[in-house]
Structures are given as structure tokens and as C-alpha cells.
């Protein structure tokens, strides 16, 4: 392990010690609570959408969330360890076969929906 990797690992451990980051991936619907600064006040704003991809690793890891706001597609990229992220919550798991869901940018309406992932144990209980 070279010096840069060692320093990045130390920084990652230090930054992630006080944060709980849930397991999520592309296709999952997430709510990201973001700290917004307005003048001298800060408030928490919820940003809910579909994770269309994760990129990078370690300190540099980020994820992209896409939502439809007033009929217009809005995408936002969040660094995983950003101090502006208050919390991340996974609402539902999506069943996808791609790591990057950029094709959703061209789809509208029902065709842009993602099927919910069913766990094997959960499916066995339901039957």
C-alpha cells in the first residue's frame, strides 16, 4: 500500500466514522437529506429520486440521483462523504441489470419505471 492509498484510507475512516451510509445501488429509490444554507440559517431539504449510478471509490465516491420535478428531469450528483449530506435513506430496491441507468434520460412516463426487487426469502413467505 503506497503513501497516497494509506492517506486516503485514513481520511475515509475518519470521515465515515460518524456517518452511516446504507447499502444502495443503481435502480434504488433513495431520499437524500441535504443541508441547505440560506443566509445565516441552515435547513434540511429532502431530495428523493432514483439512483442512476455510482462512480469512484473511497473518498472520491459519488452517486447520481434523478427525479422528475414539475415534468422536468433533474439530476444531482452527491459525494458520498459530503458534509452537506445529513442522511441517506433507501425507500425501495430496484431490479436492474445495468450499473449506469443513463437510458432513463430518454424515457418518459410508465416506461421510465423500475421494477421493484423481490428478495428470495420475502417471495417464499408471500407464496
From Swiss-Prot:
Disulfide bonds: none annotated. The keyword Transmembrane does not apply. Gene3D superfamilies: 2.30.30.790. It comes from the Bacteria. GO terms for cellular component: cytosolic large ribosomal subunit. This protein is located at the 30S-50S ribosomal subunit interface and may play a role in the structure and function of the aminoacyl-tRNA binding site. Belongs to the bacterial ribosomal protein bL19 family. This is Large ribosomal subunit protein bL19. It comes from Bradyrhizobium sp. (strain BTAi1 / ATCC BAA-1182).
Amino acid at each position: 500500500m503506497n503513501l497516497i492509498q494509506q492517506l486516503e484510507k485514513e481520511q475515509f475512516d475518519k470521515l465515515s466514522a460518524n456517518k452511516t451510509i446504507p447499502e444502495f445501488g443503481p435502480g434504488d429509490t433513495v431520499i437524500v437529506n441535504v443541508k441547505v444554507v440560506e443566509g445565516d440559517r441552515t435547513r434540511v431539504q429532502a431530495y428523493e429520486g432514483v439512483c442512476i449510478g455510482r462512480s469512484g471509490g473511497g473518498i472520491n465516491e459519488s452517486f447520481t440521483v434523478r427525479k422528475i420535478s414539475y415534468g422536468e428531469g433533474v439530476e444531482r450528483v452527491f459525494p458520498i462523504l459530503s458534509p452537506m449530506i445529513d442522511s441517506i435513506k433507501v425507500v425501495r430496491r430496484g431490479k436492474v441489470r445495468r450499473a449506469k441507468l443513463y437510458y432513463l434520460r430518454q424515457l418518459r412516463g410508465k416506461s421510465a419505471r423500475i421494477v421493484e426487487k423481490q428478495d428470495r426469502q420475502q417471495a417464499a413467505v408471500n407464496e
